[in-house]
């Protein structure tokens, strides 16, 4: 027997106390009071670890309850056969149809799948970009000892009416040479690639700040002007703007390639 199992060895050799079961029952009954006391009185690191442990226990408990309820829903009720001669009670008349709870659960799952499919993109995951790679520190001031300015090293979109702030107030600089106005957009169903103007940056997966700055990186969702494609809605109206996802690295290729989200 391993050396660390000396307690098990002692129990096998001498048995347990005569009041072991009673002491165990009382200890389990007091457990709730002990947990309540610790939750109210613990402070510092021990309180953090206690809260973390309790959170994990509650999550596991809720998961187990949800699985149990799901198994109840999935169980089909026994159908009533009117030929048996037993009259069905009034409160069970609406249960002759299939289980409504199961049908409702299935419809909700189907809607979730449709929603996920609707918003699915060609590139669901992209590589993270650090701030050191995104921004370059610019030295300013008479002695070049101030370093509060940053220059974006990636391609950006700034829009038509963009005006730079005064030099003394501009903290983040977007170079003119790295600004993009158009993108090579590919229609996945038609199989054509068109040079379309960019209307705006919808979402950059790296950070909300990069979305606000209009940074164009791989996986960014942009809005493009698709009026040249002649797309129309079911009501006969011309589609003006549509979303597309960037599939290349604009700072490496020097251009923006995107796939239209249809």
Curated annotation (Swiss-Prot):
Residues spanned by motif Nuclear localization signal 1: 11-18
State where it is primarily located.
Answer: nucleus
Q: Report the subcellular localization.
A: Nucleus, Nucleolus
> Nucleus: present as a keyword of the record?
yes
- UniProt motif Nuclear localization signal 2: location: 51-58
Region span, Disordered: 1-39, 61-86
Pfam families, from UniProt?
Ribosomal_S8e
**InterPro entries attached here?**
NSA2_fam, Ribosomal_Se8/biogenesis_NSA2
Query: Which keywords does this Swiss-Prot/TrEMBL entry list?
Result: Nucleus, Ribonucleoprotein, Ribosome biogenesis, rRNA processing
GO terms (BP aspect): maturation of 5.8S rRNA; maturation of LSU-rRNA
Which Gene Ontology CC terms are recorded?
A: nucleolus; preribosome, large subunit precursor
Q: Where in the sequence does UniProt note compositional bias of the Basic and acidic residues kind?
A: 18-37, 61-83
Main role? Involved in the biogenesis of the 60S ribosomal subunit. May play a part in the quality control of pre-60S particles.
Give the record's subunit note. Component of the pre-66S ribosomal particle. Interacts with NOP7 and RRP1. Interacts with RSA4 (via WD repeats).
| Record-stated family | Belongs to the eukaryotic ribosomal protein eS8 family. Ribosome biogenesis protein NSA2 subfamily.
- Know the name of this protein? Ribosome biogenesis protein NSA2
In the UniProt record, the gene name given for this protein reads: NSA2
